């Protein structure tokens, strides 16, 4: 139905010319507007997505969803997808028309459902190197803020990462489908599942970019982690720092050094865990590549 197809398996060799991303994604967009009314009628009570957690949550979206997003107020600076306010988004697609300037890089992102302008400010040498390594024709993951300017929509990127494993493309589009289904699910179905204690078995843990419980709570359902220095327990410790209300209320997020000091763990170890959790959609970069927040906004 959603037709997300990826040619080839791994590898990162692409030609920079000819064609567009439709040949890769196979028409992988979908039509969220068909069920929007159901989501917009969801308010209050259990289930659904409370207004207070909407705007800052990182949502995986397609370009078509961005272009179809409704504007939520008179100054036309806020957007909503399926009734949920959106400010921070994740997109996956092909970089086109890259233009390097002294302070920033602009390009067009094509994901097969449409095209959107993207701007990435280069605040330091790390940002410059990140963008220098990516060229026209590369497929990228973009995390950034959705903005409106002169009647047009664009993304101001916080991070741009070149894709080397094409499972990331499939994962992103499946994630988009799942988010769409969750946002448009009738309230009665949400409440019925809550009342009967029926778990939502369609959502794997790695695909949740919102409304997640801390991972330590999930792990305790099965068994408590037995090791104290590596593996799941260390990941939980790092994520729990980002789930701290004081950290979640900080718009800029926190850096690797902060987490390292708080947990008394090596910065290199913490940094690797954070990068892995960014790739899984649990964390995202904010003002630069050194500050991160949880995608759970609760």
Curated annotation (Swiss-Prot):
DNA-binding feature ranges: 89-163
PTM section of the record: Phosphorylated in a cell-cycle-dependent manner (from the S phase until mitosis). In response to DNA damage, recruited to DNA-repair nuclear foci, as a hypophosphorylated form.
Record-linked InterPro entries: NA-bd_OB-fold, NA-bd_OB_tRNA, RFA2-like, Rfa2/RPA32, RPA_C, WH-like_DNA-bd_sf, WH_DNA-bd_sf
Disulfide bonds: none
GO terms of molecular function: single-stranded DNA binding; telomeric DNA binding
Gene3D superfamilies named in the record: Nucleic acid-binding proteins, Winged helix-like DNA-binding domain superfamily/Winged helix DNA-binding domain
Record-given protein name: Replication protein A 32 kDa subunit B
Higher taxonomy: Eukaryota, Viridiplantae, Streptophyta, Embryophyta, Tracheophyta
